[in-house]
Amino acid sequence: MSLTAAVPILRQGDILIVTLQGDLGDADWAKLTDDLLDRVAERRTRFAVLDLSVVDVLDSFACRTIVGLTNMVALRGPTMIVAGIQPGVAFAMVQLGATLPGVSTALDLDHALALMTHG
């Protein structure tokens, strides 16, 4: 799968939005992590949103990668928000003990944008 088509990283002012649009392989997850960390460093980013709205299920590698990715981005400074966690994804993350300490969650992208403006 082409990462460019699968995982666009959009910048809107000081916000980065990553919308997953399909299943990613392990190499794609690693590239996404590198690309997002590079984009955070390019310019001052206040918020980074990982939108999982269309992801129904994640394997253990993807769950661990999301935890690592969100922690790495947050350590770089931006407030990290994970949006659109579907029931199957939430179940997998809980079963694997994957938690997102210090990371905000939102029902969907609109809710994430509201959190950025209204806290």
Predicted regions and their residues:
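Expand to "…catalyze enediolate/carbanion chemistry for C-C bond making/breaking, isomerization
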Residues: 32-41, 77, 110
